[in-house]
From Swiss-Prot:
GO terms for cellular component: cytoplasm. PANTHER family: UREASE ACCESSORY PROTEIN D. Required for maturation of urease via the functional incorporation of the urease nickel metallocenter. This is Urease accessory protein UreD. It holds the Pfam family UreD. UreD, UreF and UreG form a complex that acts as a GTP-hydrolysis-dependent molecular chaperone, activating the urease apoprotein by helping to assemble the nickel containing metallocenter of UreC. The UreE protein probably delivers the nickel. Its main location: cytoplasm.
């Protein structure tokens, strides 16, 4: 089944954010936004060093033909945590592809914690997401992605549509991690062990920029009381966690435990769960 990958109508939301370190306080110094994307006023629940930001999609959901473009830049030594106000919803399409593109640049000594809430693909959604991160020497990135295929609470399964996810993380022209995922919506793929194995949720967490010890890898594997499948893979400059299962809270709890582990190890910071996750 062929899909139209060139949207000809719909929203084109844009969000450009620049963070800078000012006397050991991270400030959002540039903010350009175009509906339906918007960022709330920055706040500092753990002190001035780390700037917390919450992104909103004011239209409530994404339809075929929509385009969302993000450009995020952390200047040297800036520290930011960015999440979203709610789960993303990708609605059923009549043939047009919805697309999200995120470009992130992290300068020396800076760290971004990119922690969006889950994305829910309705049956029949046609969606592509691209994430590219450019790391300077001494920069760090922690990001996760949690995707639910079908509104499983209603018994819906992802039997129609298409999902593509392309992720690239680079440092000075050298690829640190390249990930390509494609899932066509059909019953065979949904139940195949090479697809979703009948499970509606997949998740990935990646930490890149600083090498981790074998002890950290072992701890990450042992964290979380999960019924779903999970795995941890060591990378040259970090590591990768994968999940496939049936519970959003299960995967997020595991990812949050891993995130906390890294915060303590590399920044001597305690967990600071975004309040918006509890609303």
């Amino acid at each position: 089944m062929a899909f139209n990958s060139q949207p000809i109508e719909g929203w084109h939301g844009k969000l450009d954010l620049v963070y800078a370190d000012r006397s050991n306080s991270t400030q959002l110094i540039y903010n350009h936004q175009q509906a339906p994307l918007k960022v709330q006023r920055p706040f500092y629940p753990e002190g001035e060093k780390v700037c917390h930001s919450v992104i909103l999609h004011t239209a409530g959901g994404v339809v075929g033909g929509d385009r969302l473009s993000y450009n995020l830049h952390l200047q040297p030594n800036a520290q930011a945590l960015i999440t979203t106000a709610a789960a993303g919803k990708i609605y059923r399409s009549e043939g047009l592809q919805a697309r999200q593109t995120i470009d992130i640049k992290i300068d020396a000594g800076a760290c971004l914690e990119w922690l969006p809430q889950e994305t829910i693909l309705f049956n029949g959604a046609i969606y592509r997401q691209d994430l590219r991160v450019e790391l300077a020497t001494g920069a760090n990135f922690l990001g996760w992605e949690i995707t639910r295929f079908g509104r499983s609470a209603r018994g819906e399964k992802f039997y129609q549509g298409e999902w593509r996810s392309h992720t690239e993380i680079w440092r000075q022209g050298v690829p640190l991690w390249i990930d390509r995922q494609w899932l066509p919506g059909n019953e065979a793929v949904f139940h195949s062990p090479h697809g979703l194995a009948g499970q509606p949720i997949v998740g990935s967490l990646v930490w890149l920029g600083s090498a981790v010890s074998t002890e950290i890898i072992a701890k990450a594997r042992n964290l979380g009381n999960t019924q779903g499948e999970k795995g941890v893979t060591s990378l040259e400059n970090g590591f990768l966690c994968r999940y496939r299962g049936a519970s959003t809270s299960e995967v997020r709890n595991w990812f949050t435990d891993v995130w906390q582990l890294l915060r303590v190890e590399f920044f001597s910071r305690s967990k600071c769960t975004p309040r918006v996750w509890q609303t």
